[in-house]
């Protein structure tokens, strides 16, 4: 772990300074003894030697630094706040800010900055840690080999956590050359070891087992490369490195987890599950030593695999198991100190990274949304958004929960109208006074506010509007100006449903393209194409919510913005025209609405954008394991261009009715009915036919349409009715039936 390196290097620092002129032999001996005691784990003796050194030279901040590190290890790494405070005080004595590290003179203070970077790493302040690490990397040449490796490994880990995979791969290449070159120099320099003074023999003695150190470093490099390639989805390069990992690490839990992730990306889900089950997680060190709950990762990864397989209920089961394991693990940790100055103390520093509750809540919420339990999903996601409030995709998911929770009778909408029960609410009276009461279809357009503030997080349409507004604000105005902001708190070990990887040769050619993304923790950052797709989805949902709330101007604004997007999928273009038409009809702009309802506007209803640009780093074009893979067609969605054009014609007929152009409306109705199966005709179309016949004075024909639950009676029935007078003359003026907006039953 990085903390171990921090302590070892911190204890070595003063020992190295003993070579400086003006230092007595007694100080050198004390320095050497302190290092030996620290390496042996005898922190009491180490502190005693450092105390004697401090009495000799009270102004040497390096002794204070080493004492702070030794005290930290003596407390089993539980005094994180005290160590952080000491390092900040020492830094203020040396420099007022990290930005002042601009010369080789700062090499003397490198150990102080490195220890600060390690603490920031465990506090999940990744960007601050990277800032320090990159400053140290500028002066890495004078550093000792082991310390230089520690700086590089820390930077690589930080780059991967912040999804800067290209920088990580470049640094791994440099690190690999550094290790091979250092190993070669050690072999050539063995003859000079006996001529070194006692102060220099100790570092050489530590590198006496250089072969073991080099092999361990190589194994770690291979694992980091696999993680980078997985992030960039470079499966060919990842396959090569996986072989190296298995050769160097064997069937250890980390190597099997990485190989399982690789098979998961390839779509070999059964093999990925088999690899996970073959890992012996019981032999892996406990979370108190590593800060990682392997059981939690195991269940989470199983949940992700079953999510990709479309087995959402089983995936939810595994995610809940992971959440339970995470809660049990956190319960074993000492309770946090109530003192604000000691909130990170009382437990090992590595355990500050143990809690993955909010990542798991996010996964559970997405899984529940796919299952069709929006209210339960809302409860999980509303808790996750308190931490990941900068994720626009998460705000969209919350809005989708609200929309789905307030959706109408989706079963009836999906299956069409199985019986007249769908349009007939009740029958009152008998004989001459017998009346048919038609069901109202306009309840969906009622406001949902019951007097509560719309800012209260409940699954209402008002709150959905707020969520969508937040999502739009978090997206960059110009998709080509998306900045590289990597301050995400994601963990590459938990296997979230979004992931990414590619070789250094390939990524170097695509660096400019890959740098354009915005963070979306706990998922992968959003790339340019993903930002465009997300904006289209948010605009479509915003138009739908605006219509549901009766805010027609806002709905029209969002629908028009949606239709102006340069890369718009056929499905969202279809919805954009429908939503714009409904808003225009509500605003009494029928002519403009008819323009949007032209069936020729629909040429494609695919969920994706046909593009020559493939996912960056994808070698084959495997399906990306995200929650938006679109493996199943959403309910209530037109399955073909024909059904979409039919929906357009039904709506166009309604628009013509509003202008009293009943012949055109009847023509649209007949044309639409001839394009689909009678069972697929929506109940609103039946009502439209009834309305047209009533306007034409054909009361009995309208009754027959309701009775037979068919859009048009048989030809024989129509000819018979033409010969007979109408059954009853209406004594009251005809009241037009309020036609529902067909787009209200559409859902993305």
From Swiss-Prot:
User: Where does it reside?
Assistant: Cytoplasm; Nucleus
**Compositional bias (Basic and acidic residues) spans?**
1-17
Q: Where is the composition biased (Polar residues)?
A: 487-509, 605-615
What does this chain do? Answer: Component of the CCR4-NOT complex which is one of the major cellular mRNA deadenylases and is linked to various cellular processes including bulk mRNA degradation, miRNA-mediated repression, translational repression during translational initiation and general transcription regulation. Additional complex functions may be a consequence of its influence on mRNA expression. Is not required for association of CNOT7 to the CCR4-NOT complex.
- What is the official name of this protein in its record? CCR4-NOT transcription complex subunit 10-A
**Family to which this protein belongs:** Belongs to the CNOT10 family.
Please list the residue ranges that the record marks as compositionally biased, kind Low complexity. Answer: 185-200
InterPro entries per UniProt: CNOT10, TPR-like_helical_dom_sf, TPR_rpt
Gene encoding this polypeptide?
cnot10-a
Keywords, ordered alphabetically? Cytoplasm, Nucleus, RNA-mediated gene silencing, Transcription, Transcription regulation, Translation regulation
- Gene3D superfamilies, per this entry? Tetratricopeptide repeat domain
Q: Which GO terms describe its biological process?
A: mRNA catabolic process; negative regulation of translation; regulatory ncRNA-mediated gene silencing
* Subunit structure as annotated in this protein's UniProt entry: Component of the CCR4-NOT complex. cnot10 and cnot11 form a subcomplex docked to the cnot1 scaffold.
């Amino acid at each position: 772990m990085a903390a171990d390196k921090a302590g070892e290097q911190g204890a070595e620092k003063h020992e190295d300074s003993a070579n400086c002129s003006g230092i007595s032999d007694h100080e050198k001996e004390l320095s050497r003894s302190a290092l030996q005691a620290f390496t042996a784990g005898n922190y009491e003796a180490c502190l005693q030697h450092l105390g004697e050194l401090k009495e000799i030279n009270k102004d040497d901040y390096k002794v204070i630094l080493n004492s702070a590190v030794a005290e930290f290890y003596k407390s089993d790494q539980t005094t994180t706040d005290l160590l952080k405070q000491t390092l900040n005080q020492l830094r203020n004595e040396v420099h007022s800010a990290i930005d002042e590290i601009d010369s080789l003179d700062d090499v003397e203070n490198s150990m102080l900055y490195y220890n600060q970077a390690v603490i920031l790493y465990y506090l999940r302040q990744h960007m601050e840690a990277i800032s320090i690490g990159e400053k140290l990397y500028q002066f890495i040449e004078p550093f000792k080999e082991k310390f230089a490796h520690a700086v590089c490994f820390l930077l690589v880990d930080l780059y991967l956590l912040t999804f800067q995979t290209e920088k990580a791969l470049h640094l791994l290449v440099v690190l690999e050359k550094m290790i091979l070159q250092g190993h070669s120099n050690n072999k050539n320099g063995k003859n000079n070891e006996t001529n070194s003074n006692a102060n220099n023999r100790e570092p050489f003695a530590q590198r006496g087992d250089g072969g073991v150190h080099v092999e361990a470093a190589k194994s770690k490099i291979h694992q980091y490369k696999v993680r980078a390639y997985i992030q960039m989805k470079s499966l060919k390069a990842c396959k090569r490195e996986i072989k190296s990992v298995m050769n160097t690490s064997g069937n250890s839990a980390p190597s099997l987890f990485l190989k399982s992730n690789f098979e998961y990306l390839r779509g070999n889900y059964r093999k990925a599950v088999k690899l996970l089950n073959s890992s012996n997680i019981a032999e892996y060190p406990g979370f108190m030593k590593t800060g990682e709950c392997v059981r939690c990762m195991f269940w989470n990864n199983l949940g992700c695999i079953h999510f990709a397989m479309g087995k959402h209920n089983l995936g939810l089961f595994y995610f809940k198991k992971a959440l339970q394991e995470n809660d049990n693990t956190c319960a074993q940790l000492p309770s946090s100190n109530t003192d604000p100055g000691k909130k990170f103390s009382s437990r090992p520093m590595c355990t500050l990274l143990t809690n993955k509750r909010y990542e798991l809540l996010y996964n559970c919420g997405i899984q529940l949304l796919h299952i069709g339990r929006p209210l339960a999903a809302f409860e999980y996601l509303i808790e996750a958004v308190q931490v990941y409030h900068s994720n626009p995709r998460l705000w969209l998911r919350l809005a989708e929960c609200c929309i789905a929770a307030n959706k109408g009778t989706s079963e009836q909408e999906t299956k069409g109208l199985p019986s007249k029960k769908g349009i007939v609410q009740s029958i009152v009276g008998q004989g001459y006074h017998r009346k048919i009461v038609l069901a109202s279809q306009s309840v969906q357009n009622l406001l949902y506010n019951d007097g509560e503030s719309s800012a209260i997080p409940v699954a209402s349409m008002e709150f959905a509007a707020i969520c969508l507004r937040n999502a739009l604000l978090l997206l960059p105005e110009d998709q080509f100006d998306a900045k590289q902001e990597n301050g995400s708190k994601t963990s590459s070990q938990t296997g979230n449903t979004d992931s990414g990887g590619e070789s250094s040769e390939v990524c170097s050619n695509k660096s400019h393209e890959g740098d354009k993304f915005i963070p979306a923790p706990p998922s992968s950052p959003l790339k340019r194409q993903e930002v465009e797709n997300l904006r289209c989805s948010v605009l479509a949902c915003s138009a739908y919510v605006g219509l549901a709330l009766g805010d027609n101007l806002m709905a029209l604004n969002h629908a028009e913005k949606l239709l102006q997007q340069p890369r718009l999928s056929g499905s969202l273009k279809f919805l954009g025209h429908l939503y714009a038409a409904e808003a225009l009809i509500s605003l009494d702009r029928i002519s403009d609405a008819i323009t949007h309802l032209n069936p020729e506007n629909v040429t494609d209803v695919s969920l994706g954008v046909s593009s020559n640009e493939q996912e960056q780093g994808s070698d084959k074009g495997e399906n990306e394991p995200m929650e938006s893979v679109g493996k199943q067609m959403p309910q209530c969605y037109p399955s073909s261009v024909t059904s979409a054009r039919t929906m357009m014609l039904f709506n166009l007929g309604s628009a013509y009715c509003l202008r009293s152009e009943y012949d055109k409306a009847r023509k649209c109705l007949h044309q639409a009915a001839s394009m689909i199966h009678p069972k697929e005709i929506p109940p609103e179309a039946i009502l439209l036919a009834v309305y047209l016949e009533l306007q034409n004075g054909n009361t009995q024909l309208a009754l027959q349409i309701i009775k037979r639950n068919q859009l048009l009676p048989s030809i024989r029935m129509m000819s018979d009715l033409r010969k007979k007078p109408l059954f009853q003359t209406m004594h009251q003026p005809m009241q037009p039936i309020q036609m529902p907006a067909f787009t209200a039953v559409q859902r993305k």
